[in-house]
């Protein structure tokens, strides 16, 4: 069952779901709560790497990832990050989210941004039960013009579903949780897959 706005407010009031900083009740409507863009970004560098072998030896994948991903880029409040057509970038939500082990979250981009060509999450929009941390966004500009993205702008909406029971392996309890407690735009850790 997906939570409605009054249930989202109640879950926040009771501390069942945590969103820090807490959004105002005006940002909780229908079945979603708005989230804003943080100030941590990562991009792909100009590079000569012909490809990344996603199933290659762990050491080679790690070396390839280090060659192509930038260090963390911090954008000051009021400044803009420009995402050019055909570019992919990583960023975070301003808010940090904590879910219990019986709630799954879903991130959706804003329709107004999609109509300009901005994909907020390329494919990974599930927030696992037991999640704690900021949500990394996988931005892609499918439009024709560069887009100026500024910290604190409304970037997406979260919705929440109650599971049929409590997850036996919630994200925060898993030893293989690669992005546990993330607070910045962490690049891919596919090299840590088994």
Curated annotation (Swiss-Prot):
DCTP binds at residues 110-115, 128, 136-138, 171, 178, 182. It comes from the Bacteria. InterPro entries: dCTP_deaminase, dUTPase-like_sf, dUTPase_trimeric. Residues 180-194 have a biased composition (Polar residues). Keywords: Hydrolase, Nucleotide metabolism, Nucleotide-binding. Pfam families: DCD. The keyword Cell inner membrane does not apply. Residues 175-194 are annotated as: Disordered. Transmembrane segments: none annotated. Its EC number is 3.5.4.13. The active site is at residue 138. Homotrimer. Belongs to the dCTP deaminase family. This is dCTP deaminase. One of its GO terms (biological process) is nucleobase-containing small molecule interconversion. It catalyses: dCTP + H2O + H(+) = dUTP + NH4(+). The keyword Membrane does not apply. Pathway: Pyrimidine metabolism; dUMP biosynthesis; dUMP from dCTP (dUTP route): step 1/2. It comes from Actinobacillus pleuropneumoniae serotype 5b (strain L20). Catalyzes the deamination of dCTP to dUTP. The gene is dcd. One of its GO terms (molecular function) is nucleotide binding.
